[in-house]
Curated annotation (Swiss-Prot):
Protein origin, superkingdom: Eukaryota
Compartments in which it is found: Nucleus
Stretches that traverse the bilayer: none
Entries under CDD domains matching the protein: NR_DBD_DHR4_like, NR_LBD_DHR4_like
Gene that encodes the chain: Hr4
Phenotypic effect of disruption: Flies exhibit larvae that precociously leave the food to form premature prepupae, resulting in abbreviated larval development that translates directly into smaller and lighter animals.
Record-linked InterPro entries: NHR-like_dom_sf, Nucl_hrmn_rcpt_lig-bd, Nuclear_hormone_rcpt_NR3, Nuclear_hrmn_rcpt, Znf_hrmn_rcpt, Znf_NHR/GATA
Biased composition (Basic and acidic residues): 400-429
Any one Gene Ontology cellular component term annotated for this protein: cytoplasm
Protein known as: Hormone receptor 4
Region annotation Disordered: where it falls in the sequence: 30-50, 145-327, 380-587, 672-820, 887-913, 1015-1101, 1142-1210, 1341-1371
Residue ranges of every copy of the NR LBD domain listed in the record: 1250-1518
Family assignment from sequence similarity: Belongs to the nuclear hormone receptor family. NR1 subfamily.
Biased composition (Polar residues): 34-46, 430-451, 475-489
């Protein structure tokens, strides 16, 4: 009864096992000959193995950085470093951890970190070793915690970004009498206030605080360090500049050439630095001397083995093998011999004396800036030397050891007081020396950033941090004078911090004269005094291997950098002066790590990274800081976009497995700079590689190209059909749409965080080039999105730079200059020519649709159309503008969609002469043959798209997903070719799935396409005639020209009315909306037109609308005469194919699209009230005409919403046929089998009577209670036979019942025998979960009210009220989501667990603990209960249940999809009568529970306890 909780398949487990075996061999070969091997991996957290396997990290490591309290049991016999995330966030008061030494003389070092939030304490992760327990508790403000000897950890609810560090270093010997317990404590909070910890903790706190700009240097406490063989490896900056406050691992000391096993995971999103350290104790070295290698320095990270250390992306794993590595903090390497040496009290005294001498020797050196963390290796040899925990705390031996420890502490206390006094003197000296050093700083050499002389600095820093936190081990018996001393230290720290704050303010005043724009940004920044962003110079920028890969692209930027070199150096000088203000002893490194990604140029390009891609973790780590650093609607919009972006990675499985990231920190999982600066959440930072933003800033080519500039790719390892594949994802640069100079000062004012002067100059220079090259829309975005202001923090700063929304956005005062004038001609041309632009335009303009994440084709074929461009989700792509407008709020395309009408009233576009020049394929630019699947393509791309969709092929790209697709190389990358097909607007639903030829000549979709194609050609001819006339009439005004053009087009359609009524309505509706889109594109979001222009546009639109309504009335009469009425039509006819009751059916759109369209509609109504001038009678007839003739809003989206302003909201986006083609409301649940709109046999609507008959047949054959329950359950429980025999009987019963049910189904004869067997094999657990949940939802309330049971057991039996109890609680509305703390949910889960406990105790014949039960089936019971409650709240009906059951049975079976579609139509027809107000919403609500049912069913399979549903149902009726 053990629940396997690993999220991986058997193949993954096998590879995991192989990884562990390899590690075991390597570690055993490196360890001593004690015979110890690696701990049993089933009892240890997988995070504790280093170097971490990518597969290994998902299961256990996600808890390390959650805001919740997650005690991780650390199995101590691990001969390697214990890597856990470390954090040193910004302003904080150190809430030190309280360590209680248990009586067995073994103490595991516990480090606790405080998390983000205003004064929040973080998660404490306790390390429990083989010996006694260690208790740590983090403290919130003004709350004192007492230490206990049990494993405990408390966390603050506000610490959502906290990362916890746990490092165990037990130091004890079997006969040691004077062991100073080693404990490591480093706690820090990330808040904007000064204090986050409680200062008044009696005998449990060591006070180490800092003010708002200096973070606490509360480093690590460990056993007294040896003074012998102390080596210091100074920082060796290569190329000069710091490389980001990353985490580094040093291999030094007595480690003789072995590869370092120290791995530091720095996964947190803090405000200014990501410092962390790790250390590795070498296995038993041959020398008897202990060695301590301390490495400190500025965060220049130059690993020699090629492993990058990066903190800015939120995650870094660095493994170094050379002592040349330098870290942001400090890493101490201690050998195991040192620990053995410390176990003897006489040697302890020697160490104390040596340490005193060494401290006095280096007392004059300056203190280092950054606090570090120490992670000490726990080896089996040290575990062996520890005594076992005592049986009783009151035993005599433990009391004697305690007394001996007290005597040691008394001796150490005097030394500590002297060291504290020395330390205070050192601080004063360091302040004065650092102030003197400020005047000597020069700007250009970045190597001078390492503070002072490095050699003695390192050693003294190490002892300074030890002395700072040394009283932590003595606080249990320390006198009150110790606390007075600590408070005086704290007061001194605050004074120093205030002094630093003052100096920093003076420095910024000096900057204000020379850099007013930068000062202006700092005034807007909430943390302007904290963040100092250091931009590396030109020499540093080219050290990245990504530059070596893309060196041709760098030549443009080298010229650009040379022009700005002097200004950069001046900026460097001031920034370095600011930097040295913050290198005081209590100040952390406040440099911006996202811009300092210096790497070793010799390393390989592809290095295995491990990322925790759990999205709830990303949201928890990011959103509090988002709400903290920006206010109001900007933060809310940015948060919404951030949450929306991360949806597809919530349970992300790229082509089959959870992703592993290679070569990049998976920037598309973490929102960076979500456009909050302009008040709109639609601009997303396109940089896919935030950790190397200094390198990706160079990757934007200045020349026009077919594809956007390639950023540093993020490679995701995936698995498809057992084959390892790579998915190269990148985030698209949103089009800047040719911004002018007037926009940049505004963006600079609104950017809340530091954009350096250099980047502002790059923006302005970039905007000049964008004005010169008007067709290049996504030009400089990689440069504008670089200043992610904090390492991994989700900030709503407009670090997107030039990528602001210039139309279609949500709010944000944008000037009229933000409308791109060069896009208007192109937009109008796109509108009239259905996306067929000029050849030269297509070659110079990158397509705006780039899916922000890798296109997951498996999920696409499974029905997840959320990856498609928004235009595909709205209509049949009848105009190209609808895609751009519809996506302006989601993909940052406002510059294209919004700028479409700004110049139309001033300078009309010249019609194209496409009939004279050949059509060009929109995919590969080959000669096109016509309109295929929605766009103009060649035969090759048409066939490629058709075969891909019909065969559901899954492609992968070996590059970064942006391969150029041309005629010459279109066959090189199928993934990018198909992706471009989707982006350009080819419609998946238009592909015939039955593989029948003759698609052009039959079917509604193809009729529609033929009409569209004819309209396209005739419109071009008419435009040419008009162009010839207009060239002769140049004196006419531009507004009159627009009106004449519309009038002439309408006259043309009136002439064609009798010949082609259907064509007339398509064309007329399209052109009328085109007129309104020309006149009203910018009225609602930004009032960019003058009042006179608005009035004129409204008048023209109203006239066109009135004329359109008259034509509709005439057309209705003609339709009635020609066709003999509406109701008698054949269903397969395109136009009036709908019955009267279906005329009121809403289109099938997702709620998000409906909401977006309603908002746009309301905005247009408010902006132009002239649009709704028609009478109610005309409005009603227009609605009917829209249903019958399919002309309204084929463009869809907000652009056409003005024309349909008088329509009901559910009809805004067009007709039922068109929405049935895209059917976005069922996207998540239905597979990609929407040929119901293509095949005429599936177009027929099922009548309500017929649907009721089919549903009743299902109800008659459905033995719900027989399947859901066990007959004679009481006898079953009391049966004394073998448990295995009982379970076999249950299994046989399941099989028999399901086979009997399927044989009664009306479509049983249509199912082949092998498919029938496969169905039962694959779907039995899903059907069982659905039946269980529906049974309890349908029958539980009746039993709960009656109180009795069917088998006569009394109502007082506890087993008879599990479903009746929660019904007394108030039931929320069905729309309300079910939370884990919902009283009904909690009550029902507890009732189910108690029922299971009772029944299983009876069944097994032995008591079963509730904890064990929760561990085994708790998660599954939660899921089942959640489904039950949701079914109960939405008042599930029996008719809906049987349809859902058939749907689940037939789901994902290609051969049976026609049957499945038939019953979906049956359910839809039933819902149109049972829920006439909103049947589609009801259908979506029902289908939305299918993924939850599948998840619960998978848990049921994993637990192997398939009898749980039977037990619950049977016990509830017993």
């Amino acid at each position: 009864m053990t629940l396997s909780r690993g999220p991986y398949s058997e193949l993954d487990k096998m590879s995991l096992f192989q990884d562990l075996k390899l590690k075991r061999r390597k570690i055993d070969s490196r360890c001593s000959s004690d015979g110890e091997s690696i701990a049993d991996t089933s009892t240890s957290s997988p995070d504790l193995l280093a170097p971490m396997s990518p597969k290994l990290c998902d299961s256990g490591s996600a808890g390390a950085s959650l805001g919740a309290s997650l005690p991780l049991p650390l199995a101590l016999p691990l001969p390697m470093a214990l890597p856990l995330p470390m954090s040193l966030p910004l302003p904080l008061t150190a809430a030190s951890s309280a360590v209680t030494v248990s009586l067995a003389a073994v103490v595991a070092a516990v480090a606790e970190t405080g998390g983000a939030g205003a004064g929040g304490a973080g998660t404490a992760v306790t390390a429990s070793g083989a010996g006694p327990c260690v208790s740590t508790s983090s403290t919130t403000a003004a709350a004192a915690t007492s230490s206990t000897s049990s494993l405990s950890s408390s966390s603050s609810s506000s610490s959502s970004t906290s990362s916890s560090t746990s490092s165990a270093s037990p130091t004890a010997g079997a006969s040691s009498t004077a062991t100073c317990p080693a404990s490591s404590s480093s706690s820090s909070g990330n808040g904007s206030g000064g204090k986050s910890g409680s200062i008044k903790q009696e005998h449990t706190e060591i006070h180490s605080s800092s003010s708002a700009i200096s973070a606490a240097a509360a480093s690590t406490v460990m056993s007294p360090p040896p003074a012998e063989a102390t080596r210091s490896s100074p920082a060796t900056p290569e190329g000069g500049g710091p490389a980001g406050d990353g985490s580094g691992a040093t291999g030094g000391g007595n480690t003789s050439g072995g590869s370092t096993a120290g791995v530091a995971i720095n996964e947190h999103q803090n405000n200014g630095n990501g410092s962390g350290g790790s250390s590795r104790a070498s296995p038993d070295s041959l020398e008897e001397k202990p060695s301590t290698t301390t490495t400190t320095g500025r965060p220049t990270l130059t690993p020699t083995n090629g492993v990058l250390s990066s903190a800015s992306a939120g995650t870094g794993i660095s493994t170094g093998s050379s002592a040349k590595l330098s870290e942001a903090g400090m890493s101490v390497i201690r050998s195991v011999k040192e620990e053995r040496l410390l176990n003897v009290s006489s040697k302890m005294l020697v160490f104390h004396q040596q340490r005193e001498q060494e401290t006095k020797a280096v007392a004059a050196a300056a203190a280092a800036a950054a606090a570090g963390h120490v992670t000490v290796l726990v080896t089996p040899s040290r575990i062996k030397s520890e005594p076992p925990p005592p049986a009783s705390p009151s035993s005599t031996s433990s009391t004697q050891r305690e007394r001996e420890r007290e005597r040691d502490r008394e001796r150490d206390r005097e030394r500590e007081r002297e060291r504290d006094r020395d330390r205070e003197r050192e601080r004063e000296q360091s302040i004065s020396s650092s102030q003197q050093h400020l005047s000597r700083v020069s700007a250009s050499p970045p190597t001078q950033l390492s503070h002072g002389s490095l050699g003695p600095n390192i050693v003294q820093t190490h002892h300074l941090h030890q002395q700072l936190t040394q009283p932590l081990t003595l606080r249990k018996s320390s006198p009150p004078t110790e606390h007075l001393l600590s408070q005086s230290m704290q007061h001194l720290t605050q004074q120093q911090a205030i002094h630093l704050h003052h100096l920093l303010g003076q420095q910024q005043q000096q900057q204000q004269a020379s850099h007013p724009q930068q000062q202006q940004q700092q005034q807007h920044s909430p943390h302007s005094l904290v963040r100092v962003k250091k931009e590396p110079n030109v020499g540093q920028r080219h050290l990245s291997p990504h530059h070596q890969q893309q060196s041709p692209l760098l030549q443009h930027h080298q010229q650009q950098q040379q022009q700005q070199q002097q200004q950069q150096q001046h900026l460097h000088q001031q920034q370095q002066q600011q930097q040295h203000h913050q290198q005081q002893p209590q100040a952390l490194a406040l440099m911006h790590p996202a811009s300092l990604a210096l790497r070793n140029s010799n390393r390989d390009a592809a290095i295995l990274f491990r990322v925790k891609s759990e999205v709830h973790q990303q949201v928890a780590a990011g959103l509090p800081h988002l709400m903290q650093s920006a206010g109001g609607a900007a933060a809310a919009a940015a948060a919404a976009v951030a949450a929306q972006r991360m949806v597809c990675f919530s349970n992300a499985r790229i082509n089959g497995v959870k992703p592993e990231v290679i070569g990049g920190p998976l920037g598309n999982l973490r929102p960076v700079g979500v456009g909050g600066g302009n008040g709109s959440g639609s601009v997303q930072c396109p940089s896919p590689h935030p950790s190397s933003s200094s390198s990706s800033s160079q990757l934007s080519p200045q020349t026009p190209s077919q594809t956007p500039p390639r950023g540093t790719p993020t490679v995701i390892m995936g698995e498809s059909c057992g084959v390892r594949t790579m998915v190269w994802g990148y985030e698209p640069p949103p089009p800047s749409a040719g911004q002018s100079h007037g926009q940049h000062p505004q963006q600079q004012q609104q950017s809340p965080h530091h954009q350096p002067q250099q980047q502002q100059q790059q923006q302005q220079q970039q905007s000049q080039q964008q004005q010169q090259q008007q067709q290049q829309q996504s030009l400089g975005q990689q440069q504008h999105c670089l200043s992610s202001p904090s390492a991994g923090s989700l900030t709503p700063s407009s670090s997107s730079g030039g990528g602001s929304v210039s139309g279609g956005g949500v709010g944000g005062p944008l000037t009229p200059s933000s409308v791109a004038p060069q896009n208007n001609e192109e937009a109008a041309q796109l509108l009239l020519s259905l996306g067929q632009t000029r050849i030269q335009d297509m070659r110079s303009r990158p397509h705006p649709f780039r899916t922000p994440h890798a296109l997951n084709m498996e999920r696409l074929w499974a029905g997840d159309y959320s990856q498609l461009p928004p235009g595909q989700l709205q209509a049949l792509n009848l105009s190209a503008q609808q895609q751009q407008w519809g996506s302006s709020n989601s993909t940052g395309l406002g510059g294209v969609g919004g700028g479409m009408g700004g110049r139309n009233l001033e300078a009309p576009h010249e019609p194209t002469d496409e009939d004279e020049q050949p059509l060009v394929c929109m995919i590969c630019e080959d000669k096109a043959t016509g309109l295929h699947y929605g766009i103009i393509t060649c035969e090759g791309c048409k066939g490629f798209f058709k075969r891909t969709v019909q065969n559901r092929r899954v492609y992968t790209c070996v590059a970064d997903g942006t391969c150029e697709i041309t005629k010459a190389q279109r066959n090189r990358c199928q993934y990018c070719r198909f992706k471009k097909c989707i982006e350009q607007g080819m419609v998946l639903q238009a592909v015939r799935e039955d593989r029948m030829p003759g698609g052009r000549n039959s079917g509604a979709v193809y009729n529609l396409y033929k009409v569209k194609y004819k309209k396209h050609k005739k419109t071009n001819q008419k435009q040419q005639q008009q162009a010839a006339q207009q060239q002769q009439q140049q004196a006419a005004a531009q507004q009159q020209h627009q009106q004449q053009q519309q009038h002439q087009q309408h006259q043309q359609h009136q002439q064609q009315q009798l010949h082609s009524p259907l064509h007339h309505h398509h064309h007329q509706g399209h052109q009328s909306h085109h007129a309104q889109q020309q006149h009203h594109p910018q009225l609602s979001p930004h009032h960019l037109l003058s009042p006179q222009q608005q009035q004129l546009a409204a008048a023209v639109a109203a006239a066109a609308q009135h004329q359109q309504q008259q034509q509709q009335q005439q057309q209705q009469q003609q339709q009635a005469k020609l066709m003999g009425g509406v109701v008698d039509m054949k269903p397969m006819f395109l136009g009036p194919a709908l019955k009267p009751e279906l005329l009121q059916a809403p289109p099938m759109h997702s709620p998000a699209q409906q909401q977006q369209q309603q908002q746009q509609q309301q905005q247009q109504q408010q902006a132009s009230p002239h649009l709704s001038l028609s009478s109610p009678h005309q409005q009603q007839q227009q609605q009917q005409g829209q249903h019958q003739n399919h002309h309204q809003q084929q463009g869809g989206g907000g652009g056409g919403a003005g024309g349909g302003a008088q329509l009901p909201p559910h009809l805004v986006n067009g007709t039922i046929l068109k929405t049935a083609l895209t059917n976005p409301s069922e996207i998540v649940h239905l597979r990609h089998r929407l040929d119901s709109a293509v095949s005429s046999s599936k177009d027929r609507q099922i009548s309500y009577e017929h649907a009721l008959g089919m549903i009743q047949t299902l109800i008659d054959c459905d033995a719900m209670e027989d399947i859901a329950t066990l007959p004679h359950f009481s006898e079953f429980l009391e049966d004394k036979s073998e448990i295995s025999e009982k379970l076999c009987n249950i299994g046989d019963s399941i099989v028999h019942k399901l086979v009997s049910w399927t044989k009664k189904l009306p479509f049983y004869l249509e199912i082949p025998v092998e498919i029938h067997t496969k169905l039962l094999t694959d779907k039995w657990h899903e059907i069982l979960i659905l039946t269980t949940a529906a049974y309890q939802a349908l029958h539980g309330k009746r039993r709960g009210e009656g109180g009795g049971s069917r088998h006569g057991s009394p109502a007082s039996t506890p087993l008879s009220t599990p479903t009746g109890t929660p019904l007394s609680t108030p039931i929320p509305s069905p729309a309300q989501p079910l939370h884990k703390d919902d009283p009904e949910f909690v009550s029902e889960v507890n009732s189910h667990l108690s029922t299971l406990q009772t029944c299983l105790t009876t069944l097994m014949g032995q008591p079963i603990a509730m904890e064990q039960l929760k561990l085994d089936v708790g998660h599954m019971v939660d899921k089942m209960t959640q489904i039950t409650i949701m079914f109960r709240r939405i008042k599930l009906k029996m008719e809906e249940y049987v349809c859902l059951k058939v749907y689940i049975l037939l789901n994902k079976e290609v051969e049976l999809e026609s049957i499945q579609e038939r019953y979906v139509q049956v359910l839809r027809s039933y819902l149109q009568n049972s829920s006439p107000q909103n049947p589609q919403a009801r259908l979506s609500e029902l289908l939305s529970h299918i993924p939850e049912i599948q998840a619960a069913a998978s848990l049921l399979l994993e637990s192997k306890m398939f009898y749980v549903p039977f037990v619950l149902n049977s016990a509830s009726i017993r």
